[in-house]
Amino acid sequence: MVRELKHMEIGDIPVDWKLQTFDETFRVISNNTLSRENLNNRGGAVRNIHYGDILTKFPEVLDCNEEEIPYVNELSLLSSSTQLLQDGDIVVADTAEDETVGKVIEVQNLGDSKLVAGLHTIPCRVKKGDFAPGWLGYYMNSDLFHNQILPYITGIKVSSISKGAISKTLILVPPFDEQEKIVQSLNKIQLLMTTETKVVNKIKLVKNGCLSKMFPQKDDTVPKMRLPGFTEAWEQRKLGNM
């Protein structure tokens, strides 16, 4: 059966999907301005989302139980206005060296841990709309949303997006059960990607180990690891003599 569509500002969407502005959907909450040197990976009372991790490390939906999130070195570094994040909050990276500016993460599975948003981020909390966990993280990293940001990016060497500009973007709100189905499908893909990445990383370690053992070390003439049938010493020649 062909699904009935309606034409909206961002294109044709299903008739039972809603559209609302970023401003209608979110309220911006307070972040901090801590740089990487104020963070550590050893431990602490409060963890901090750095914009660089949003751009290069974190997936669209940040599982706080699984991802390594740096800690604030000292609580005294946090201003009293900094607000703790909650499940369902989104954090936008407002600065980058390219058009990845505007990448978003959605916070999930915080549990009892404390988390804040750091330098060059725009943390936001939903004030209108019923969203399935994960929907905003996936939707706001789609081309449909990110392309809305592109006209508002400023800067030459460093790209940035302002709170005022991002407030003009539009948020799609499908029926809740459809959001859940879409998120479930994308979660399966993300899990597959994560699993395959771990396998590839293990293979890379094996390869690097082979590279270090299958070639002679300095001042040696035989490698530590050899293939069957090879026992002779290796020769070393200058490239110009070959």
Residue ranges of predicted features:
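Short, surface-exposed secondary-structure boundary micro-motifs
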Residues: A96, S185-N187
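Non-catalytic DNA-recognition/assembly elements of restriction-modification systems
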Residues: R3-T33, K168, R226-M242
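Acidic/polar-enriched heptad-repeat coiled-coil alpha-helices
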Residues: V183-Q184, L191, K198
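Short, well-ordered beta-strand elements within core beta-sheets of diverse protein domains
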Residues: E9-D12, N73-L77, I122-K128, K168-V173, ...
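A short beta-sheet element
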Residues: H50-G52, V61, E67-N141
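Sequence-specific dsDNA recognition surfaces
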Residues: K6-H7, D23-N41, D53-I90, G240-M242
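A short glycine-rich beta-alpha junction/loop motif
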Residues: V2-K6, V15, R36, G43, ...
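Short amphipathic coiled-coil heptad-repeat segments
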Residues: M1-P14, T195-E235
